[in-house]
């Protein structure tokens, strides 16, 4: 996905001190952010001009100790054609030499009201999510008790109908039919809907419904971390399904592994309640309580007692 300086300005509500339409349309190609401290003393080895340049209180205070000519020289070297923008934090005053060098080199100058660390964190979070490589998977993503559950299965097995029932039970729809997944970092997988399918759910026999319009803003989310995969499968008498919770199946998406639970589907079974229970049980395991282990311990104790008798 392409992220422009204008998109960053709109997302973080930054003030444009200098920058025309062309400069604000510049693409940001990396989520890495540079604080040009060493560059201000003339050290440009390993300098990355393609990064956003963030000036905080430390850099600003040091600039005040320099002469006007030195300040201009520093910014003339920092600002390159490939530099997307420079952001000054805390609403600090923009040095005239910075503006002059920015105009000469075609670099937008932005100003934020937040602290430097807060601004840096917000920019990194936004850019990492927007610039991450995406993969589209078939399924439905639902937020169940704050946990992202990816529901997969054959076409027509009832994924969307199950998601609708979960929404009616107070959970939140993230994406239907196509889920765009991406890794925000090494161990965190996120999912979001395609823009054209935002808040929409397709129900066979009914058509497309707008979940936000019908059930309100509390029934939808624009994105969610993906923590569990539920695979719906047609029930077959000769098929073996996990009955104790011993299964350790996983799927890998974008290099991130998440647990997978296979659930058989047959007439009369309330799949949405089963998925809800599976999500709660998984969360309980994450918190240290394992019902399967409890059952095994009780069974072992019972066998021991019977053996003694």
UniProtKB/Swiss-Prot annotation:
Q: Which SUPFAM superfamilies match?
A: HprK N-terminal domain-like (SSF75138), PEP carboxykinase-like (SSF53795)
Q: Which reaction does it catalyse?
A: [HPr protein]-L-serine + ATP = [HPr protein]-O-phospho-L-serine + ADP + H(+); [HPr protein]-O-phospho-L-serine + phosphate + H(+) = [HPr protein]-L-serine + diphosphate
Can you tell me which residues bind ATP? 153-160
The record, for InterPro entries, names:
HPr(Ser)_kin/Pase (IPR003755), Hpr_kin/Pase_C (IPR011104), Hpr_kin/Pase_Hpr_N (IPR011126), P-loop_NTPase (IPR027417), Ser_kin/Pase_Hpr-like_N_sf (IPR028979)
Needs which cofactor?
Mg(2+)
- Gene3D superfamilies under this entry? HprK N-terminal domain-like (3.40.1390.20), P-loop containing nucleotide triphosphate hydrolases (3.40.50.300)
Top-level taxonomic group: Bacteria
GO terms for biological process, alphabetical: regulation of carbohydrate metabolic process
Spans annotated as Important for the catalytic mechanism of both phosphorylation and dephosphorylation: 201-210
Signal sequence bounds? none
Q: Which UniProt keywords apply?
A: ATP-binding, Carbohydrate metabolism, Kinase, Magnesium, Metal-binding, Multifunctional enzyme, Nucleotide-binding, Serine/threonine-protein kinase, Transferase
Where Mg(2+) binds, per the record, is at: 160, 202
An example Gene Ontology molecular-function term: phosphorelay sensor kinase activity
Additional facts recorded: Both phosphorylation and phosphorolysis are carried out by the same active site and suggest a common mechanism for both reactions.
> According to its UniProt record, which protein family does this protein belong to?
Belongs to the HPrK/P family.
Complex formation: Homohexamer.
The identity of this protein, by name, is HPr kinase/phosphorylase
């Amino acid at each position: 996905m392409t992220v422009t300086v204008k998109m960053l300005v709109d997302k973080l509500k930054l003030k444009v001190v200098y920058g025309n339409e062309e400069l604000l349309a510049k693409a940001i190609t990396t989520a890495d952010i540079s604080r040009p401290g060493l560059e201000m003393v003339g050290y440009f080895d390993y300098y990355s001009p393609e990064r956003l340049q963030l000036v905080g209180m430390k850099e600003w205070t040091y600039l005040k100790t320099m002469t006007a000519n030195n300040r201009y020289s520093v910014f003339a070297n920092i600002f390159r054609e490939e530099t997307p923008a420079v952001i000054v934090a805390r609403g600090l005053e923009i040095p005239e030499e910075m503006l002059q060098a920015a105009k000469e080199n075609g670099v937008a100058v932005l100003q934020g009201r937040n602290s430097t660390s807060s601004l840096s964190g917000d920019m990194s979070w936004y850019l990492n999510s927007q610039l991450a490589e995406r993969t589209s998977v078939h399924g439905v993503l639902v937020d169940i008790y704050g946990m992202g559950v990816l529901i997969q299965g054959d076409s027509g097995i009832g994924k969307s109908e199950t998601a609708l029932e979960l929404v009616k039970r107070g959970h939140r729809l993230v994406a239907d039919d196509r889920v765009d997944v991406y890794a925000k970092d090494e161990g965190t997988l996120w999912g979001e809907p395609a823009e054209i399918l935002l808040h929409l759910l397709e129900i066979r026999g009914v058509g497309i419904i707008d979940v936000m319009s019908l059930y309100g803003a509390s029934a939808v989310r624009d994105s969610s971390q993906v923590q569990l995969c539920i695979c719906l499968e047609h029930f077959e008498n000769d098929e073996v399904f996990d009955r104790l919770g011993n299964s350790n199946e996983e799927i890998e998406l974008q290099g991130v592994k998440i647990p997978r639970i296979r659930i058989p589907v047959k007439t009369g079974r309330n799949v949405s309640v089963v998925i809800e229970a599976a999500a709660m049980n998984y969360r309980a395991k994450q918190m240290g309580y394992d019902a399967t282990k409890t059952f095994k311990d009780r069974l072992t104790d019972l066998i021991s007692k019977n053996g003694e008798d």
